Amino acid sequence: MSEKMYPIPFKSLMNWVVTEYAREGEIFGVHTPYYASGKTLPIFGERIETPFGPAAGPNSQLAQNIIAAYMAGARFFEVKTVQKMDGAELAACVPRPCILAADEGYNQEWSTELEVPQARDEYIKAWCALKVLSKVYGLGDPDGFVFNMSVGYDLEGIKGEKVDTYINNMMDASETKQFKECLEVLTELFPAEKDYIASISPRVSRSVTVSTLHGCPPQEIERIASYLLTEKRLHTFVKCNPTILGYKTARTILDSMGYDYIVFDEHHFNEDLQWADAVPMFERLQALADSKGLEFGLKLSNTFPVDTTRNELPGTEMYMSGRSLFPLTIEMCSRISRQFNGRMRISFAGGAEFFNCDKLFSAGIWPITVATTILKPGGYNRLHQMVEKVEGLPYHAFSGTDSAAISDMSAASHADFHHLKPIKPVASRKSEDKSPWIDCFTAPCKGGCPIHQDIPEYIELCRKGLFGPALKLITEKNALPFITGTICAHRCQSKCTRNFYDESVQIRDTKLLAAKKGYGALMADIKVPEKVAGKKAAIIGGGPTGIAAAYFLGRAGIEATIFEREEKLGGVPRYVIPAFRICDEAIDKDVALMERYGVEVKCGAPAPSVEELKKCGYTHILIATGAWQAGKLDIPGNVKGVIGWMKEMKTQVKPCLDGHVVVVGAGNTAMDAARVAKRMGAASSTIVYRRTKKEMPADEHELKLAIDEGVNMVELAAPVAQENGKLKLERMKLGEPDASGRRSPVATGEFFEIPCDLVISAVGEKVDAKLMADNGIEMERKGPAFKTNVENVWCAGDAHRGPATVVEGIADAAAFAEAVIGAAHEYDIPETAYASKAEAIAKKGILKMAKDACCEGSRCLDCSTVCENCADSCPNRANVVIKLSDGRHQILHIDKMCNECGNCTQFCPYASEPCHDKFTLFQTKEDMEDSRNAGVLFLGGDKVLVRLADVKEYDLSQQNDLPQEIENLILTVRAKYSYLYN
């Protein structure tokens, strides 16, 4: 495909709008239109019904973008910047992809990619459409919104014929061909509104925001603003760059908030507008505006230039936005507000979103424009929630900004969850699969779970208070609901789509809630099945993997026996993991659940050998003995292995420590050990790691808990020797990435010491190689193969993988059970476990932090019912939802509306690019030839051109070899969505 997008002719655009609204009650993917409350705010001699809108950028470039934003509640539109360079010349300077908004935002966009006259026409089309839609559909006052021009980048270009004509036409569009066409089309569509349509004001905009390039001299900025105020008599905002804060301030703020990896140097700070020049210039411009009876203010802020160092986007420089920009922007606001005693009007853009928009508005900062937040899942729908949040606040004319409140906001932002970067880099939320053309909706949490739990379904059952059915559904795949509900590493949560909104659904907590509330009913309903003849399984090891294997076998009627050397089942969770993380009661309940199926348990003695077990009639044997041998830390001194030491700490009646404890290693077990040492009275507890916190294998949550409890962290250090109350360490530095993707530690030859009386080695536990050798089992790198070289002997969990997670052990246990049983476990999911499409769609665009597990059903986005992330996140609306006659939703990509910005790619749960990989609708043969996408071109009548593997012409009235689902999609588009291509 080409990155060139086509403006939609106004008649086609309005046909789309009218048809979609009549049929669905929505427009351009905005599911819940905003109906204005009647309150207004005065600005520029006009009125706006809400203080929000899209910032000049990807969401304000095309008519459909602006209409979508209006439908969601936007009423202040800073339309995309125009300058003398435009069209193909400009587009050639923009690399693709050019937007990355998965976390903090980055972009490489400039001004409009359209030709300036095309951009003008898009804004006129949107203006006229909103004037009528607001009235006809009762969305608000037709005079309740404002269009604000954005122009740049130098006075010569602004005064040139191209941009000058644009400004004049936006100030008075009456003589433009587009304005006249709009009135004709609207009159044809809404004949009852003929007189009103004829009265639509051609004065599209009476205000402007000045955008200049980095390095623009202050004299040039002042000349541009003065020209627009005096010659064009336009209310004027001047956009400022965060560089006005100075390099040291920006670097300090970002570093302190976890953005130390963002690279930039001082040159923009030195070349951009300086504070000493800015203040007197703004005073002069304010006085000039006052003398002309016009409004003047500042737009804070522009995006922030940073270096491209991690292949985030093509090219060498990109522009930062979103949550990392907010602390810089609000600090700019604070300094401006104080400097001008609250008299300077501030228009805000720079990380505004739901969680801070009310504070900004209450402090007198408005209008508030957004970009990054509405580029994420939920898209334009996010505006509706923002509008509702401020509706209850007082609306009044601008009377000044609250300097104290803004200063408080600035200080608070440095510790605000919504703006802080996690300590550890966020893992990819994508699966390894490619998106199918049809039925692509999937729940990424399921894919992130080693046992593929039915997560949205059991959360929905919990939402409905059906805890018994929820736990029954959980235990279809998960034999340990209490253990996993307490200490599961919950990889599912790192995949959760809600991470793109606020924070993940608390899946583990919800599982534990179901376990606690549904346990009694589940136990009462269990019936021991009849035993299967001819099969008998021995399980060596009574940890989580062994318990899970016994559960799955017992449920299927397979006679099974667990052999455990300790006095009780539970393995590492019972004997090693500290009680402050998991209590024995939780383990006991999972054990009782397994025993309910009649499994035999033999504790307190080593298991017989494999050969002896076979002689006793066991047909299938599982070794699930864990990885209890300490990893070797080859240094002299007082060193203990973490597993043995933690078992000692847990089993002692009143363990007590003194002196300084150092834990070497940085996995979850290391964090547990360090926390145990701290709680047991150690003078200090310290983690020593060869890399930095970012590379630590421990879960982010476990790392934070250790830090919060006062555990010291010594990064980039390797132990050398412990003696005389000290641990000698060698400083390390990070070199090139190793096979794990983490940068390898490299010795520097520099040494230092820290207090240390005891070293705990937590550098990776090992499988008992002697046990394997004694039974003739061959070892691989970490342990034996799952199905070992010995007939009918399997190895699972830590004994197979090396140190692994509980849920990975359950996955191995299930695979072993399936091998023994000879068939996969089958079960039904009750209909009550599925949210309706309407319920799923209603959650889109709603940001909401977790409170407790009972609330999580309202936060789960039901991705397997409705995903549509690519449709939400496309600013141009180029990924549309097609509703088939059977109720299923499908995604169709519209080639002519896409500029290959790449934003949709970030939010697709597959390893796919929707703009390239979804079935595509083409407008012309040339477009189809210029693309590699699978898709369709309607040729007229029943004839279509379709590319799957090859391009082929089909007659839809005849039998053909098109896949049925593809043909069904094409026929639906022709029957119900012809406005997409006509």
Where are these regions (language model features)?
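N-terminal capping/small domains of soluble enzymes
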Residues: 1-231
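Rossmann-like dinucleotide/flavin-binding elements
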Residues: 540-561, 602-611, 625-633, 645-700, ...
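Glycine-rich phosphate-binding active-site loops on the catalytic face of alpha/beta enzymes
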Residues: 75-87, 240-242, 359-389, 691
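A conserved short coil-to-beta-strand element within the FAD-binding core of flavoproteins
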Residues: 602-616, 631, 716-726, 732-735
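Catalytic cores of alpha/beta
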Residues: 63-68, 352-370
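Ferredoxin-type iron-sulfur electron-transfer modules and their immediate structural context
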Residues: 317, 323, 328, 374-375, ...
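Rossmann-like dinucleotide-binding cores of NAD(P)H-dependent redox enzymes
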Residues: 559-562, 566-601, 674-720
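Glycine/Thr-rich beta-alpha phosphate-binding loop at enzyme active sites
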Residues: 22-37, 242-342, 377-395
